[in-house]
Amino acid sequence: MLVLDSGAVSRLAERSRASAALVLALRDEGLWPAVVPSVVLVECLQGHAGRDATANQLLKTCDVVDQIPVGLARRAALLRRRARRGSAVDAIVVAIAEPGGTVLTTDPDDLEALAAYSQRVVIERI
């Protein structure tokens, strides 16, 4: 499973050849559509249709997870406590990638700290 954080959504939504090539490569590897927890949208959208247009186009190709079950929220809280860093959104991103998933990000520091306490989650920088 491939999970995107807000930085990855923003980067992949850029109108660049590199971003388009990466999405195509992920699709070819069977890793697309990516999973995006809905709480990530709070960090990568601005609430303006024009400014959010490219991100919204990308999100239409992803599996956006609307509901965060209580068990997943508790797991994210445990990851935050153990790592002693990271936002609630970052912790949910890592928890949803368990077990054995990959998180794509532009800022791996807090995510790597959380993943150190996860079940085999890998953090990849784009």
Indicate where each model-derived feature is located.
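Alpha-helix capping/helix-boundary segments
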Residues: A8-V9, V40, L72, I92-V93, ...
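Acidic, PIN/NYN-like endoribonuclease modules and their adjacent C-terminal/linker elements
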Residues: E98-I126
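Acidic catalytic patch
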Residues: T61-R82
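Short, well-structured N-terminal submotif of metal-dependent ribonuclease cores
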Residues: M1-V35, L45-D63, E124-I126
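Phosphate- and divalent-cation-binding pockets in alpha/beta enzyme and binding domains
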Residues: E43-C44, R75, A113-L114
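Short glycine/proline-enriched coil/turn segments at helix->beta-strand junctions
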Residues: A49-A53, R81-R84, A97-T102
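Short beta-strand scaffold positions
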Residues: V36, Q67, A88, T105-T106
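Acidic, metal-associated active-site segment
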Residues: C44, S87-T102
